[in-house]
């Protein structure tokens, strides 16, 4: 059984790794804390999230760049180069899959079972929804549908907990609404539902803005700005008749909207 001193050491190493931009080691240290099966502090929770976000973020950026180059090569008829890029893209996709599987295991086996506070429960289900969404960004066919279904399920669980436990101005509840709306837009190709969710979250937060404490004011208002930016971007995609637009190939748009940590 690890001692309090061990836990403090893991957290300190994670902070060092973050400053040194060694995010894989940051994740490893915070996984050691998660494996203790204790309720993580807000600081520990954020360290774990930031570590994984950077590890996955680098690969997501690589995948988008490779996909864009691949499309250009295909449009030029450069089949040999397109094949090379496809093979390289699959390597990145394997890394993405492995990271997401690792996140799910930590969340399901350690974080959710150890979560006592409502805020923690929302945070972890939101995180689960995010990483299934990242899988759905590049998976195809049945695997894409399965990842999308699991992402939806996790976001819905997070939303139920958030509405019961957190005020509309809470940054975690706002971040959840932001990311869930991005899921509707990018994965389900539904700008109408994305806008509805984002607008509802924004309006509810605005109506209670005077209750916002100074501590979370900056975080909450930043996410509200992102919600508004996405609404502006997405509104133009809603057809005149109000029906959801379904993109023929079912692939996510690159840069379809901002999401939260």
Curated annotation (Swiss-Prot):
One BP term from GO: post-embryonic root development
Spans annotated as Disordered: 237-261
InterPro entries found in the cross-reference section: 14-3-3, 14-3-3_CS, 14-3-3_dom_sf, 14-3-3_domain
GO molecular function: calcium ion binding
SUPFAM superfamilies recorded: 14-3-3 protein
Highest rank taxon of the organism: Eukaryota
Family classification: Belongs to the 14-3-3 family.
Record-given protein name: 14-3-3-like protein B
Organism: Vicia faba (Broad bean)
């Amino acid at each position: 059984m690890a001692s309090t001193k061990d836990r403090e050491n893991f957290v300190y190493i994670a902070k060092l790794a973050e400053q040194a931009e060694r995010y894989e080691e940051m994740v490893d240290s915070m996984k050691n804390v998660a494996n203790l099966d204790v309720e993580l502090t807000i600081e520990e929770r954020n360290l774990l999230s930031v570590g994984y976000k950077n590890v996955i973020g680098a690969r997501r950026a690589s995948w988008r760049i490779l996909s864009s180059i691949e499309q250009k090569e295909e449009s030029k008829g450069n089949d040999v180069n397109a094949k090379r890029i496809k093979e390289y893209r699959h390597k990145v996709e394997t890394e993405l899959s492995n990271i997401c599987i690792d996140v799910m295991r930590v969340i399901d086996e350690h974080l959710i079972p150890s979560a006592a506070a409502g805020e923690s429960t929302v945070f972890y289900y939101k995180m689960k929804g995010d990483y299934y969404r990242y899988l759905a960004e590049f998976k195809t066919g049945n695997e894409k549908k399965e990842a999308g279904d699991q992402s939806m399920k996790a976001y819905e669980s997070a939303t139920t907990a958030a509405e019961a436990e957190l005020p509309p101005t809470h940054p975690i509840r706002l971040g959840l609404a932001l990311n869930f709306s991005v899921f509707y837009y990018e994965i389900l190709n539904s700008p109408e539902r994305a806008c509805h969710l984002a607008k509802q979250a924004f309006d509810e937060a605005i109506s209670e803005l005077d209750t916002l404490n100074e501590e979370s004011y900056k975080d909450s208002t930043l996410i509200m700005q992102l919600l508004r930016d996405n609404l502006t971007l997405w509104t133009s995609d809603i057809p005149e008749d109000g029906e959801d637009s379904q993109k023929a190939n079912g692939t996510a748009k690159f840069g379809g909207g901002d999401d939260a940590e």
